[in-house]
């Protein structure tokens, strides 16, 4: 019943199945007609889902950089010149074991395995570091998805607001895309409430101020057509997306970037 109530609230933002144009004040034309054009700098910020983990402690499931690989491939195919930025060492630092396979394409080999995804982190931890990350990476886009590890705690929504506040203060020209976070494999009311606050309160507040902040709905990517959570889209049917789930996420991020920052036509 709670899930049904969530789904009855109309989305006001971008999602993969029906991407609507971003507000005109957020749209820009991107001139990238030759190799000398400046790459679009993209900072992916979040927890283990941003790093690309699966619920797979023995790493028997191949590691494919989570949504970041699919996003990179889509951007490249569309003609964008991009550079992912960030300094997280995960998952290669061995904190949760090291992937056994060699992903293909290997984003490390082409200098694109750059992000700020940190396994187990919550909004408070990201808040402590976001100033440093923005100052160092100087992003054009910030893809922010954080909160699954503390959505049930009262400070989470306020922390998220403070994170976005710090980003727009330090880098007002950057586009900040705040994700409504993915669910766990079983419905959790606190996540539904957290996402509602992102969609209906946080993002509209920043938009009224003229900030380049919008949202995407990553939650719906993990649902069945009837609106219930799809366990088959989770690795080991637990909490992290599997390859199909991550691909859906990649498409949603791509749709947002393309809508906000379309390539100029020749």
Indicate where each model-derived feature is located:
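Extracytoplasmic, non-cytosolic globular domains
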Residues: 66-70, 156-206, 253
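Extracellular low-complexity, Gly/Ser/Thr-rich intrinsically disordered linkers
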Residues: 125-126, 139-141, 146-152, 159-167, ...
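Catalytic His-Asp segment of secreted/periplasmic serine-dependent ester chemistry enzymes
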Residues: 107-110, 115-118, 182-266
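Structural recognition of the beta-strand scaffold that forms the well-ordered cores
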Residues: 41-46, 50-51, 82-87, 140-150, ...
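N-terminal secretory targeting modules
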Residues: 1-89, 127, 261-266
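Sec-exported extracytoplasmic/periplasmic mature domains
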Residues: 50, 54, 72, 76-80, ...
């Amino acid at each position: 019943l709670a899930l049904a109530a969530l789904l009855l609230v109309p989305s006001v933002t971008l999602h993969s199945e029906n991407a609507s144009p971003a507000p005109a004040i957020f749209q820009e034309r991107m001139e990238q007609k030759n190799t000398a054009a400046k790459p679009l700098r993209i900072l992916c910020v979040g927890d283990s889902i941003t790093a690309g983990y699966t619920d797979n402690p023995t790493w028997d499931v191949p590691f494919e950089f989570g949504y970041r690989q699919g996003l990179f491939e889509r951007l490249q195919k569309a003609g964008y010149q991009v550079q992912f930025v960030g300094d997280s060492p995960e998952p290669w630092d061995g904190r949760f074991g090291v992937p056994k396979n060699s992903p293909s394409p290997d984003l490390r080999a082409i200098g694109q395995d750059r992000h700020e995804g940190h396994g187990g982190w919550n909004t408070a931890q990201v808040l402590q570091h976001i100033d440093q990350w923005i100052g160092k990476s100087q992003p054009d886009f910030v893809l922010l998805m954080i909160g699954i590890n503390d959505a049930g705690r009262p400070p989470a929504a306020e922390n998220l607001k403070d994170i976005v506040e710090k980003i727009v203060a330090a880098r007002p020209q950057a586009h900040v895309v705040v994700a409504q976070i993915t669910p766990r494999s079983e419905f959790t009311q606190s996540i539904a409430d957290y996402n509602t606050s992102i969609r209906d309160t946080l993002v509209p507040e920043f938009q009224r101020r003229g900030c380049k902040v919008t949202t995407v709905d990553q939650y719906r990517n993990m649902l069945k057509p009837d609106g219930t959570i799809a366990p088959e889209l989770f690795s080991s049917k637990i909490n992290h997306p599997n390859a199909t789930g991550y691909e859906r996420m990649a498409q949603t991020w791509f749709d947002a970037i393309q809508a906000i920052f379309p390539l100029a036509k020749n």
